[in-house]
Amino acid sequence: MNYLLKFIVSIIFVMISFLLSISSFANVLIQQNQLVYEGSFRVPLGNLGGASTYPQTLARGGGGLTYNAKNNSLIMISRYSEKLAVEISIPTLIISGDISKLNTANLVQVPGNIANGQWANLASDGSTIPNGGVPGGLLVYNNELIGSSWAYYDGANQATRSHFTASLNWATTGAEFNGMFSVGNPLAGIKSNGGFVGGYMALVPPDWQSKLGYPVLTGLGGTPVISRTSLGPDAWGFNPTDLGKITPVPARCFLAYTTNHPTLGNFDATSLYFNRVTQVRGLVFPVGSDSLLFFGRQGLGSTGKGDTCYGPGTSSPSQAATQTQIQAWVSANGGTNYSCGSTKMSGTEGDDCCYDAVDSSKGVHGYPYAYWVWAYDANDLLAVKLGTINPWDIKPYAIWELKLPYSSDTDPHTGPHIINGAAYDPSTQRIFISQDLADDTTNKYEPYPIIHVYKLNYSSPTVLAPQNLTVHTITQ
């Protein structure tokens, strides 16, 4: 009997040690070299029918990207003037320096007006706001299409509403639009929440849903009027099933940077984490990882360290000058205005003359630009939930440039390095990136997006055999 008891105790000890060894493994934190480029494809060209009347439906489109597992397809938003949902197939991927050799996706579902033209109905009472609404993100959830919208220039902080639901089969059922709805309550010092939540969305992996308490993350960062949005990546948890049932929809801020808490850098800071030209337009939370990957663009600036400039742009490096230098030149030349590209400057404007080979407009510049990734540890979001840190205390564990083909620093279309959105297929661990204005092979004036695909090259944590165990030998 004693031998049997010793044997049972030994087995229990081994099992406990084995289980402890499993629990000691954390999911991976994804690094740059674990995103393996698999190729790209073109979107359908020309007019795609349905609700679209424009000759090139998807030209200057490609935003709000999301993956639809039911059809193994992608859904995106068409050009800004129409703002229609379009569903396309995922063809065989090709790696080539020649765009014409890429495969072209097929149309799965014709363009549909899923928001019933109400993208700008973002005011607290549901009325339209000035300057229009910009399609933010799309997400397939519980056989519905979840969408969001944000105000392009919301100086008055009027964008309170942001999200809606629509039919996933709009071509047969109609839009079945229901919205717009408010998500979450504003942070302290913020008047309205639309500028923080009205953009990209991402599914939370099952193991993290139980930890964070929400199935979906939504956010937005780096928009005009920076005081009403996040100064960098931003993430709020919410449950889409609450849309239309609870006002506002309960949401928790896990990550955000306000003007009072600019952890990644002030608006005019020299930084590769955040600066005046930063845009954050996509989020992926890969299964089997502890990583949140945010996608967007960054300004590298003349130093390569993220310096920026405000004023008109010039394509001539020799014309770039600070306000003080412009004033000195004007004074030395008898009051003659200084030439900054096509702009004449007196030196009293309070602006610099900014070198930018792809943008001559008056505004913020950070040339050259880069496609960008911010990688965060989900355990930091959990710490926010537990109350041990604030949403603005978190910093990325890594940032890196995302090298996409078919772009050039001097090309007027791809030089700004804009990413329209990101989507994710957990069954294949593939990430889809919509590259803005990259396909101008058929029309130089109406370029199309190109879809690039990365495969996440990591596996779930491997369970190792327990180490340093003492096994008792049972002798009779």
Write out the residue ranges for each language-model feature.
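N-terminal secretory signal peptides that target proteins for export/translocation
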Residues: 1-7
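Bacterial N-terminal signal peptides
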Residues: 9-21
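Enriched but not universal
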Residues: 25, 347-350, 459-476
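Sequence/structural signature of beta-propeller domains
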Residues: 26-459
